[in-house]
Amino acid sequence: MNRCPDIAHAVRLLQMGEVVAVPTETVYGLGGDAKNPLAIRRIYATKGRPAGHPVIVHLAFEAPWTEWGQFNDHALALAKAFWPGPLTLILPRGTQALDEVTGTLPTIGLRVPSHPTAQALLRQFGSGIAAPSANRFGRISPTTADHVFMEFGEQIPILDGGPSKIGIESTIVDVSQERPALLRPGSIGQSAIEAVVGPMGHSDTVAPGSLKSHYAPMTSLLLSHAPEEDRIRLEKEGKTVAMLRAQPPQEYAQNLYAALRKMDTLGVDILI
């Protein structure tokens, strides 16, 4: 595995315009200098991702956020409540925002991750890091350094920060309009958001990670209230079936992508 020996090495690579896999509490990201158009294009090329789709910029907690996006009262309240953490805010773009990052949209997605390695990297780098999930386009998001290696081999240097504690992508809230709107659910639920900003509105804003072919495992996932009955029925139909053991919701989220990757490797048809 092409591991970065330390954070300083990862910083040097980012300063050179290279792409580095970085850990966050949600999933591993494919990181590049958010102020370097060439680095952003390298991210798109490495992922095989369609151009013109926005990517999230990750910032240090101490960073000058308002250079990247325009914060209204709702945005500031949500940032105070949930940053650092698994929340991405969609805001009117600021002066530092490149078209390559925003997909030429008038908005930008910003997040302040809570992962200590990610925060240390961002502080030492001293700028924003654009980082969609560190997988090939349409594949399952990685939650460990090994998952990233499965996707890219030695092609991408990896800053190993251990397994992602949350394991699913960040909640995305659009705060670029009068009423905030939930664009992508995540570990921070709608009720928690509304406790801060009141009832949510509706938005047609394009969110990072919202293309229809995102996060598409080969194994189908079945949510079931009668898992044993469904297993018997599906096996009678000739399907290869596996079951994810009962566990608290937070553990389900943390283990889901790893389980789907394993099922893809084993050739399982359906995971219950």
Protein language model regions, located:
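Active-site-adjacent structural elements in enzyme catalytic cores
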Residues: M1-I272
